[in-house]
From Swiss-Prot:
This is Uncharacterized protein Mb0898c. Disulfide bonds: none annotated. Signal peptide: none annotated. It is a multi-pass membrane protein. GO terms for cellular component: plasma membrane. It holds the Pfam family FIST_C. Its main location: membrane. Coiled coil: none annotated. The chain crosses the membrane at residues 54-74, 347-367.
Length: 386
């Protein structure tokens, strides 16, 4: 497998597409591309068809997906404020593109357009439009019906309203639904960094009703939180005031869950009179949860730890990666440009990297697929997998 990335920031959409495709093609050193990922910044929304046409004139891969996004990633750079086109090419990688649509019916709704293979343990890349496809249903389907199926991707961030989204699939530009790629044989390794760290202790949920949690270990959640805060430093108390999150343990068989074992959800509200809290997830009695905090320093540490752990466990050589990082990260979170991209390149030795800023990140935690926020989710492609 060989992977190449090309990028061009010239304002002319067609010229940028031609130059980016040419750069990526040259990096394949004569090998034929088997998969292309085409990404454009929001400035090129109205010329998405021209971008795709220009790329296909330069290369004609058997599989192509992509989108127009709020900001895009190329190499060690995150291009947030200028027009750009990025082309990511891979050779020697089996790939099959597909699209999905969400159709409402008199009795409910249907997901149409593609059937996941129940017998295969394949990796799927998914790029859903947030306005026409409920991403939570998209993620829950493989969890419930297809255990072992891993999905990675990002909710497309390029549109400000319904109809603004631009998705690429092979020779077509779409404005709704989901585009995706099936990668047989798990040639990609999912890597997910949620940017949080736990505080206090894990508690068993002893009282819950939907998204409302009334008891943690037999006491109101706010009482548990006050007990934790009393033992924190002033700086940590400030984080609780501005960046408090809830972590739900995914694998209840873990004796001592730690960083990376939780799916992180937001705190929606609290009732001081009862001590209960509401979170952005339905929670069952018996689940284990722990309060979490998120800040730039913690997110940097978590990303480094997650990538280093993944690199140490790779079953082969890292050939390249696709990154789906939250549009709330970047300069907004870290105060500097290029944080996630440059950190990944530093830790993985400058591998070919591309991606985009997403409005929700998709990736597995402890073997269960989830939709995240403020997260960096990555598909790390591995050559010579055992």
């Amino acid at each position: 497998m060989r992977i190449g990335v090309g990028v061009c920031t010239t304002p002319d959409a067609r010229q940028a597409a031609v130059e980016a495709a040419g750069q990526a093609r040259d990096e394949l050193a004569g090998e034929a591309p088997s998969l292309a990922v085409l990404l454009g910044s929001r400035a090129h929304t109205d010329r998405a068809a021209d971008v795709l046409s220009a790329v296909l004139q330069m290369i004609d891969p058997p599989a192509l997906v992509g989108c127009i996004a709020q900001a895009i990633v190329a190499g060690r750079h995150e291009i947030e404020d200028e027009p750009a086109v990025v082309v990511w090419l891979a050779s020697g990688l089996a790939a099959e593109t597909f699209q999905l649509d969400f159709v409402r019916t008199g009795s409910g709704a249907l997901i149409t357009g593609y059937r996941f293979d129940r017998t295969a343990r394949d990796l799927h890349l998914l790029l859903p439009d947030p306005y026409t496809f409920p991403s939570n249903l998209l993620i829950e389907h493989p969890n419930t019906d297809l255990p072992g199926t891993a999905v990675v991707g990002g909710v497309v961030s390029g549109g400000r309203r319904r109809g603004d989204t631009r998705l690429f699939r092979d020779h077509d530009v779409l404005t709704s639904g989901v585009v995706g790629v099936r990668l047989p044989g798990m040639r990609g390794v999912p890597v997910v960094s949620q940017g949080c760290r736990p505080i206090g202790y894990p508690y068993i949920v002893t009282g819950a009703d939907g998204i409302l949690i009334t008891e943690l270990g037999g006491r109101p959640p706010l009482q548990r939180l006050r007990e934790i805060v009393e033992g924190l430093s002033p700086d940590e108390r400030a984080l609780v005031s501005h960046g408090l999150q809830i972590g739900i343990v995914v694998d209840e068989h873990l004796a001592a869950p730690g960083q990376g074992d939780f799916v992180i959800r937001g705190l929606l509200g609290a009732d001081p009179s009862t001590g209960s809290i509401e979170i952005d997830e339905v929670v069952q009695v018996g689940a284990t949860m722990q309060f979490q905090v998120r800040d730039a320093a913690g997110a940097d540490k978590d990303l480094r730890l997650t990538v280093e752990r993944a690199a140490a466990r790779l079953p082969g050589r890292a050939a390249g990666a696709l990154l789906f990082t939250c549009n709330g990260r970047g300069r907004r979170m870290f105060g500097v440009a290029d944080h996630d991209a440059s950190t990944i390149e530093e830790l993985l030795g400058g591998i070919p990297l591309a991606g985009f800023f997403a409005a929700g990140e998709i990736g597995p935690i402890a073997g269960r697929n989830a939709l995240h926020g403020f997260t960096a989710s990555m598909a790390l492609f591995v050559d010579d997998m055992e």
